[in-house]
Regions:
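A short beta-loop-alpha structural element at the N-terminal edge
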Residues: 5-20, 72-73
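A short gly/proline-enriched turn/hairpin at secondary-structure junctions
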Residues: 28-34
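Short coil/loop residues immediately preceding or within conserved phosphate-binding loops
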Residues: 53, 123, 128
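Conserved acyl-donor/pantetheine-binding loop and adjacent beta-alpha core of acyl/acetyltransferases
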Residues: 75-125
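Conserved acetyl-CoA-binding loop-helix of GNAT-fold acetyltransferases
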Residues: 130-133, 139-148
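Hydrophobic alpha-helical core bundles mediating ligand binding, dimerization, or RNAP-core interactions
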Residues: 19-26, 40-44
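Conserved beta-strand in the GNAT
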Residues: 57, 63-72, 127, 132
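Active-site rim helix/loop that mediates acceptor-substrate recognition in acyltransferases
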Residues: 34-55, 59-61, 69, 115-117
Length: 148
């Protein structure tokens, strides 16, 4: 059976499916309860959306299966709707001890990334803010389609 694959812009109704793609891609359920894993995926996607100027969604048979978010550093500004979504998602994660612990871990990882980037001695004009594809759709060339 051949899949119907389409690349398109992000729609608000895509967000829950894309949060699930992130949750599966990074195996959040292996180190968090299902409830916290869902909240963490929501925070991660919301944070990435604050850091992008380009979005493309891979839709397979009408279902969001993956995404790529890019950032042109010179043109970037954070849309208020994405910042508010990020704040709301963070508040949802901060209400539990488990959520606070996981956020602290990721804060440390982010600090390491920042230090490594400073040591690079090169200014980049852009970056890939997020690139994820649901595991069940890998190997079909969808990632290449998103990247190109």
């Amino acid at each position: 059976m051949e899949n119907n694959i389409k690349l398109r812009e992000l729609k608000k109704q895509d967000l829950p499916a894309l949060e699930n793609v992130i949750r599966k891609t990074w195996d959040y359920d292996k180190f968090a309860t299902p409830k916290t894993a869902r909240k963490l995926a929501k925070v991660y996607l919301a944070t990435c959306l604050t850091n992008q100027t380009y979005t493309r969604i891979a839709e397979v048979d009408g279902v969001p299966a993956g995404l790529i978010l890019g950032k042109n550093i010179e043109k970037h500004h954070c849309p208020l709707k994405y910042r508010l979504r990020q704040i709301s998602a963070l508040c949802g994660l901060l209400i539990s001890k488990e959520g606070r612990g996981i956020l602290n871990f990721y804060k440390n990882v982010d600090e390491i990334y920042s230090q490594l980037l400073k040591q690079c001695d090169k200014d980049y004009r852009g970056e890939i803010a997020l690139f994820a594809l649901s595991p069940e759709y890998r190997g079909l060339g969808i990632g290449k389609m998103l990247f190109h």
